[in-house]
Every structure is written in structure tokens, then in C-alpha cells.
Curated annotation (Swiss-Prot):
Keyword field: Chloroplast, mRNA processing, Plastid, RNA-binding, tRNA processing
Keyword Cytoplasm attributed: no
Organism the protein comes from: Arabis blepharophylla (Coast rock-cress)
The protein, known as: Maturase K
A GO molecular-function annotation: RNA binding
Length: 502
């Protein structure tokens, strides 16, 4: 990027519309090619020559597409000619344009992000290698909250919504018109069902989604900073947010004439927001009435501002002391542990009954069994079955596959306080492995285990089982108290695929 910094510096009069000319500059294509932003798959780049040429960067293809962009009518393909032009390079050109959009449209965001960090020292964090770094945040914060809003973020159903979202951040009308033109031409291809594979670059689609979410969250944070409500210190009167700013301006008049009780403008700082995989949670200590207000804020925001049909059923209000919160593959809830503390002052002693609130992470056994049943490891009731598609592999390969899945799930859910459900999942995978091997050798499970012995199942021992057997005595290791031990594995770099399946 530093190599091309000189090309990207424009005077003040042109900074509002400098993106569109970049589509006609060859060095931008070189920039995209050098940074590897144009990958359709792991081994092929769309800025390479066609099959008839050497697989090198082609300036000839770049010159051709620039010439076609000067004459946009040549990029438009009538629906009657879609089948006839399928073998030509029009689809290839649209792939290149989507790659170029992914590079060019990110330039103002990158420059703005770099300028925001100037003169600031970034805080170093040494706990970014594990997804489990989020769980201390949940344990420290959620234990003080009462309610959680579980929001399913909707996707825009119309392309014009995406164009309008970018319009607030990209002040280049020419680029937006060209962007709208390419999107509608892409829909023309997609709706005609010629190419089943998406012709747009995944990086470009990810940028569109992130810009859409960024616009939504910026409005939400704006409302969050300015959200307040009027209430009396004696909790006798509660005011709605009708004509809220008028109430603020005439606050003294309202206080003196209409309400004899002491009033205060209350601003709740205990509001935490987390977003993950198209879902977001909003935790707070507010009352149920205020939680319903936030719920309708979200519904009206998506319907009125983003023109997206958003049903109120997609926003669930959960009470942490009663309901479970599904997040990161866990079912989290608050567990109340009564604790009696004896305190003595001189000659008098007191018994104080305290309640300790602790975040409890449970294993969603139903969803995991559903994922295993979907992948043919068991049936919908959780009874193990043989994996017929793996019988062509070698015995060691089959065993290694099952052991890898079993250990991944065991490591991921090792932080749960109750592991009975985890032991059930391990049992399903172990018996499924034995049934698969027995089916391959055309034998019964009993005869197969009798021939190989119990040493086969020792491969399924996880690192947790081995460590606990060395730390705790055998009597404690065999007791029922062991399943409450919480051990987090901090070497997991990605989520297990079975956790994300629905």
C-alpha cells in the first residue's frame, strides 16, 4: 500500500469523488494482484491469463476490461443472449470488477482507520489466540445483569438497501452508480440460473455485509449514548419517552408544576453489546418495561430505516435467572449458590446468608445430537450407528477421524461445569467408531471388541482425562464430583464445525 500512496493522494476538491477514476488505472489491478485479494479458490487467480495463455498476470486483459468500462453498454448482456454469451469473457470481466470493488471501496475506510490511530498507543493483548477469551468477559459481566436481548440480525432483501448504506460513507456518486449497475447485472445472471457459483468475489460480499452491520451498529450506539429515562428517586412515577427532548429542555418547569416527587434523569451505564455470527446479545440491568422498549427500537430501526421486514419474534427477552442464553455453542445461565457466612464482633456473632451468582455454561446436548444425526453418526434419538461412507478407509484413518472429532468436542466443552452430557457425546462417538470398524470387517460389535480388546477405546482418552488422572486421586477421579471441574483449553483457534451446524 505504501508503494501506491502517491497515486492515492488527491487535492481537497477531488477527494469526494476520487474512487471512480481508480477503476481506469492499471496500477490498481496490480495492487489487487500483488496482495492476493483476487482469489476465487486456493490455487487460481482471476487476474491470470485464460487457458490459452501462460498463467501470468495479463495487462492485456486489464486493458480490455478498462476499454469495456469506458463503454458500459458492452458490459450489459440481454437475457436472450445469456446462453449464447456464456462461453465468452463477460462473466470473467464481472469477476474482475467485483475484485476491484473489494479493493477500491476499502481505500477510504483504510485511510480513515489509519488516521484514527495516529498519536494513539494501542493496548497489547496477549489472550487473542483462543476463542475462550470471551468467556471471562461473560463471567465477569453477565453475573451482574438481569435480562438479555437475543437479536437475530436480518439480511437486506433488496440491493438498493446496500447501495443506500454505502451512500452514507462513500461520497462518490459515479462509483455508486457503477456499483448499482454491476449489482443489478449480477442479479440478471443469478436469476437466470446460468451460473450456480457466485460470480462476485467473497471479499466483496463480506465488505457489503460488514458495511451493512457497521451502519446498523453506529445508529444503535448513537441511541445507546443518548438513551435515558425519567424516574423518581422513590420509584413512584415513571415517564415514557414521548417528546423526550422537550422534557429535557423544560425539565425545571415539569418538575415544579406537575410532579411533586423528586425526579432525576437516569442514564443506565450497565449495557453491554456482543455480536457473533449474525446474532447479537444486549445485556442490561433494566426493568422488563425498558427491555420491551429496546426490543421495539430494534424492530422499528430495521423496518423504518433499513426497509427490512423484521418481526418482533426475532428479538427474544431472556431472564438470566430462569432462561438459557445460547452463545458460542453454549447454553449459559445464572446459577444462584446460597452461602452462609459466620461473622463475629467482640462477644456477638452473626450468621449472614449471602447468595453468590455464578455464570453456568451448559452443553446443548439436543443441538449436538442433531448435528451428529445430520452427519450420520447417530439417529435423531442419539443411538449410535455405523458411518457407512467411511468403511472404504483404513482402520487407522477411521480411528483417527473419530478420535479427532471426539477430542475437539471434549476440549471445546471442557469449560462447562457439568460434563454428563459431554460423556454421552463421547459414548456416541466411541460406539459409532466400533460399529463402523465392525461393519468394515463384516463382524458384530461384540466379536470385534473381543478380538481387539479394550485397548482400542484407550485412543479416545482426551488430554483432560490424562491430566486429571495424574492430579486427582483415583477415588476422586472416579467420583461424581469430577464432572463439575472446569478446565479451559486455550489452544483452540477456531470453532468446531459441529457447533455451528443447526
Amino acid at each position: 500500500m505504501e508503494k501506491f500512496q502517491g497515486y492515492l493522494e488527491f487535492d481537497g476538491a477531488r477527494q469526494q469523488s476520487f474512487l471512480y477514476p481508480l477503476f481506469f488505472r492499471e496500477y490498481i489491478y496490480v495492487l489487487a494482484y500483488d496482495h492476493g485479494l483476487n482469489r476465487l479458490n486456493k490455487n487460481r487467480s482471476i487476474f491470470l491469463e485464460n487457458a490459452d495463455y501462460d498463467k501470468k498476470y495479463s495487462s492485456l486483459i486489464v486493458k480490455r476490461i478498462i476499454l469495456r468500462m469506458y463503454e458500459q453498454n458492452r458490459l450489459i448482456i440481454p437475457t436472450t443472449d445469456l446462453h449464447k454469451n456464456l462461453g465468452h469473457t463477460n462473466l470473467f470481466y464481472y469477476q474482475m470488477i467485483s475484485v476491484l470493488f473489494a479493493v477500491i471501496v476499502e481505500i477510504p475506510f483504510s485511510l480513515r482507520l489509519g488516521s484514527s490511530f495516529e498519536g494513539k498507543q494501542l493496548k497489547k493483548s496477549y489472550n487473542l489466540q483462543s476463542i475462550h477469551s470471551i468467556f471471562p468477559f461473560l463471567e465477569d459481566k453477565l453475573s451482574h445483569f438481569n435480562y438479555v436481548l437475543d437479536v437475530l440480525i436480518p439480511y437486506p432483501i433488496h440491493l438498493e438497501v446496500l447501495v443506500q448504506t454505502l451512500r452514507y460513507r462513500v461520497k462518490d456518486a459515479s462509483s455508486l452508480h457503477f456499483f448499482r449497475f454491476c449489482l443489478y447485472e449480477y442479479c440478471n445472471w443469478k436469476n437466470f440460473d446460468i451460473q450456480k457459483k457466485c460470480i462476485l468475489n467473497p471479499r466483496f460480499l463480506l465488505f457489503l455485509y460488514n458495511s451493512h452491520i457497521c451502519e446498523y451498529e453506529s445508529i444503535f450506539f448513537f441511541l445507546r449514548k443518548r438513551s435515558s429515562h425519567l424516574r423518581s428517586t422513590a420509584y413512584e412515577v415513571f415517564f415514557e419517552r414521548i417528546l423526550f427532548y422537550g422534557k429535557i429542555q423544560n425539565f425545571l418547569k415539569v418538575f415544579v408544576n406537575n410532579f411533586p416527587a423528586m425526579l432525576g434523569l437516569f442514564k443506565d451505564p450497565f449495557l453491554h453489546y456482543v455480536r457473533y455470527h449474525g446474532k447479537s446479545i444486549l445485556a442490561t440491568k433494566d426493568t422488563p418495561l425498558l427491555m420491551n422498549k429496546w426490543k421495539f427500537y430494534f424492530v422499528n430501526l430495521w423496518q423504518c430505516y433499513f426497509s427490512v421486514w423484521f418481526q418482533s419474534q426475532k428479538v427474544n427477552i431472556n431472564q438470566l435467572s430462569k432462561d438459557n442464553l445460547e452463545f458460542l455453542g453454549y447454553l449459559s445461565s445464572l446459577r444462584l449458590n446460597p452461602l452462609v457466612v459466620r461473622s463475629q464482633m467482640l462477644e456477638n456473632s452473626f450468621l449472614i446468608d449471602n447468595i453468590r451468582i455464578k455464570l453456568d455454561s451448559k452443553i446443548p446436548i439436543s443441538s449436538i445430537i442433531g448435528s451428529l444425526a445430520k452427519d450420520k453418526f447417530c439417529n435423531v434419538l442419539g443411538h449410535p450407528i455405523s458411518k457407512a461412507t467411511w468403511t472404504d478407509s483404513s482402520d487407522s484413518d477411521i480411528l483417527n477421524r473419530f478420535v479427532r472429532i471426539c477430542r475437539n468436542i471434549s476440549h471445546y466443552y471442557s469449560g462447562s461445569s457439568k460434563k454428563k452430557n459431554l460423556y454421552r457425546i463421547n459414548y456416541i462417538l466411541r460406539l459409532c467408531c466400533v460399529k463402523t470398524l465392525a461393519r468394515k470387517h463384516k463382524s458384530t460389535v461384540r466379536a470385534f471388541l473381543k478380538r481387539l480388546g479394550s485397548g482400542l477405546l484407550e485412543e479416545f482418552l482426551t488430554g483432560e482425562d490424562q491430566v486429571l488422572s495424574l492430579i486427582f486421586p483415583r477415588s476422586y477421579y472416579a467420583s461424581k464430583r469430577l464432572y463439575r471441574v472446569r478446565i479451559w483449553y486455550l489452544d483452540i483457534l477456531y470453532l468446531n464445525d459441529l457447533v455451528n451446524n443447526e
